[in-house]
């Protein structure tokens, strides 16, 4: 078993970061995620948003893994459960693979919280527990997978920034459109008054 952990601070408020987290896929930084299906989403009586999603991924595999499973690329599935608490301003996301569970399990947990000293920033804490089963090189493979998870975490943070930029652009477009739709009738009214 190999445990990997990481912490990252986003220079964006919690509301923006959690919105981006729910819209992270697909993105150009991690093209291996080829699909996201929402299986269930509901708000509980205390106001927490619960989501259960299925992520479809397609990976090119290292040569040692190819020889073990007999495939060069494989589609895998990950189940993801998240809980967003808007009162406490926390988002916890847990994911686990549901493909190849007889060979490997990857259990990941991400937590998003406002930065304790700066509410305009958000702290992301990540943890992954990797277990390779029934292979003599399991510790080597677990280390290799931890390295891949670390690399993908960096891509994930880049993807979050990409989504946040996209969301900010959409907000600005909506604001500009709203300003324009207000100005047009006002300009027409002013023209009528001048006549």
Curated annotation (Swiss-Prot):
The modification Phosphoserine is found at residues 46, 51. Coiled coil: none annotated. InterPro entries: PRELI/MSF1_dom (IPR006797), Slowmo/Ups (IPR037365). PROSITE patterns: PRELI_MSF1. Transmembrane segments: none annotated. GO terms for cellular component: mitochondrial intermembrane space. Residues 1-172 form the PRELI/MSF1 domain. The keyword Phosphoprotein applies. It comes from the Eukaryota. Keywords: Phosphoprotein. Belongs to the slowmo family. This is PRELI domain containing protein 3B. It comes from Cricetulus griseus. The gene is PRELID3B.
